[in-house]
């Protein structure tokens, strides 16, 4: 049967990864400006995410603005949005399936084989969610790196990796690792009972020999 301890470990790892995927999707710090300004008093930090761009001043004031148009966004931002939203949805479905399929829950106890397969399906969806997140974050980071090292990019327009990218990488790793643990707990199919049958001794040799009855005329005077 499936190892319930390994299932619980995989579930909580994948659940933490899914929460991190949600946080990475919502955070606006996918890339941050590496130029602080010439004057410390007027320094402004710029952040950009999938849904908004923010500016934080040295006084602590932060102003954020949502992107006005969906069609006006760059293709990599739209692709990253789609991948992250798909990852969040896959993680939600995987969470439900994993709860139903884990051995420690009471749902579907009458069919442990089907219950184990449901847990494996949940683990596979967690892995897909992690891969979607890993693709979106890595693709975005690659473009940020290319823009940073592009000689034609002005110094005040160069960006570096934001905290959301690191959260996304860590969350993707947790989701893939937890989903792998759930997939590794596949229950073995039940085998027919092959226990040896109890030994039953056959009839004795004396019992197997036929009994010959003599006719009455062949008996002696004493009846023998």
UniProtKB/Swiss-Prot annotation:
Keywords: Cell junction, Cell membrane, Disease variant, Disulfide bond, Magnesium, Membrane, Primary hypomagnesemia, Sensory transduction, Tight junction, Transmembrane, Transmembrane helix, Vision. Pfam families: PMP22_Claudin. The chain crosses the membrane at residues 8-28, 82-102, 118-138, 161-181. Changing residue 81 to W: In HOMG5; partial localization at the lateral membrane and partial intracellular; when overexpressed in the retina of PN0 mice, leads to retinal degeneration characterized by altered morphology of bipolar cells, shortened bipolar axon and dendrite lengths and decreased light response. Residues 29-81, 139-160 are extracellular. Gene3D superfamilies: 1.20.140.150. Residues 191-224 are annotated as: Disordered. One of its GO terms (molecular function) is paracellular tight junction channel activity. It is found in: Cell junction, Tight junction; Cell membrane. GO terms for biological process: actin cytoskeleton organization; bicellular tight junction assembly; calcium-independent cell-cell adhesion via plasma membrane cell-adhesion molecules; cell adhesion; cell junction assembly; negative regulation of cell migration; negative regulation of cell population proliferation; negative regulation of gene expression. It is a multi-pass membrane protein. Residues 1-7, 103-117, 182-224 are cytoplasmic. It catalyses: Mg(2+)(in) = Mg(2+)(out); Ca(2+)(in) = Ca(2+)(out); Na(+)(in) = Na(+)(out); K(+)(in) = K(+)(out). GO terms for cellular component: apical junction complex; basolateral plasma membrane; bicellular tight junction; mesaxon; nucleus; paranodal junction; perinuclear region of cytoplasm; plasma membrane. Disulfide bonds join 54-64. Belongs to the claudin family. Forms paracellular channels: coassembles with CLDN16 into tight junction strands with cation-selective channels through the strands, conveying epithelial permeability in a process known as paracellular tight junction permeability. Involved in the maintenance of ion gradients along the nephron. In the thick ascending limb (TAL) of Henle's loop, facilitates sodium paracellular permeability from the interstitial compartment to the lumen, contributing to the lumen-positive transepithelial potential that drives paracellular magnesium and calcium reabsorption. Can form homo- and heteropolymeric tight junction strands. Interacts with other claudins including CLDN3, CLDN10, CLDN16 and CLDN18 with highest affinity for CLDN16. Interacts (via PDZ-binding motif TRV) with TJP1 (via PDZ domain). It is linked to Hypomagnesemia 5, renal, with or without ocular involvement: A progressive renal disease characterized by primary renal magnesium wasting with hypomagnesemia, hypercalciuria and nephrocalcinosis associated with severe ocular abnormalities such as bilateral chorioretinal scars, macular colobomata, significant myopia and nystagmus. The renal phenotype is virtually undistinguishable from that of patients with HOMG3. PANTHER family: CLAUDIN. This is Claudin-19.
